[in-house]
Amino acid sequence: MKRLIVYFHYDPLGQIDTACRVAVEAMAHYGEVFFISNGTLRPADRAWAASVTLTCRERENKGLDVGAYKEALAVIGRGRLARYDELVLMNFTLAGPVCSLASMFAAMEARPELAFWGLTRHYAMKSRRFGGRSGEVPEHLQSHFLAVRAPLLHSEDFWQYWQKMPLPKSYEESIANHETRFTAHFANLGCRWDSYVDTKDLRDVFVNPIMACPRELLANRGCPFFKRRSFFTPYADELRRTDGTAARTLYDYVKQETNYPVDLLLAALLQRQPLEMLARELHWQYVLPDAAPVEPAPELAAQGLALLHLPISEVEKADSVTAWYTREAARRADEALAQAAALFAKEPMLGVLSPAVPLWSAARQSRDADWQAARPALQGKVNVPLGQNPPPAPACGWALVRLAAVAGSDTLPAITAPEDAWLLPLKAQQNGFFSASFTTAAQSAAAADQLALHYQQAADPKAVAKQFGRLVKHKLKK
């Protein structure tokens, strides 16, 4: 089967990261690749794309993936496309493959009755955001990987679909006008379709299996790709549809059970996503055993580490309970220094580590307030995006730092102002390192019990009303 692959790429820095390169090189074994990027590539990246693909085209960042596909088809032309038996439209939001693609292409080539097929499907749901005027999202193949075959590929219907397609101005318009429409549009014309990954048994469980249970799809259903967005999707959205562990179990599986360079993907994401989003999805928090014997203080300098004590902020001091818990957390952290230092040997990408924020609610509120106060001064000092919420470290006036992550030498950057402490995790992120916190087993158990209590109270109207009353009373006192 002669196959053409249109690979859509976008990166605000003009880079083609490792995840894109691995995907393109793997797909190039199964067809000719037309690489199209919404933006200007760096010279080295442009040279790489030109060396491994049939065509490399750069365009204005307009119309998202739909705009790129539409332009690619116009450039290729109907006559040239007539030479191919199958067209694959694929975009950079997929990472992988974690296994050979031979099984997928062989399985789908054995199904000549299909006019088009895709990697995965999304099940029907109601959505004002993505459902357009009707608010209904039908079951559909997901647009991150769509394969269209002759004779549909060469038909007037296919070309009219793209010629009449308006350029979307937003992600929501792209989903509503193309992804959720493509499958139904051609199915209504009598075309047969299917997804390679079989998730029919999950129809009543998850509407979007590749995001909700990616490890299951990779480990047990032969899916060769996963979504890079798994590692930075808003965590509140995850909790509305899953138990919140999908990203971490995906990461552990890919790292431990495959040869895919997932840490290189993570390093690229650290340059482009807020640290706190990655930290929440990947649960960069370690639990140290309570009963572990106190070990001698490690030789930190020999490990390329440094211990940094930071003063308690004025906001933390304002609440006496917060100040007490913060001082206690710092004191206990000193006792666990050897265990904390050992984590750096285990995790080569770990840059900054600190005790977890105390479970006392005012402590977290104080830390959030400190971050918001420091955030304006941090803008422009680092070349990574700043999230609305603080990174996991530093906290509790204590941080263990990998010198190479924050300084690139054997000296620490000077800390002369409160915002300088926040620069530690941000500089580490800029250099490709993540930050994390550690907690005791007792704190971890207490956090689980607190969560259970919050769920219980959230389901009780009386408890909600009581909490609302307390909040109003507290605000009035201020």
For the regions a language model picked out, list residue spans one by one:
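ER/Golgi luminal nucleotide-sugar-dependent glycosyltransferases, focusing on the catalytic module
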Residues: M1-K478
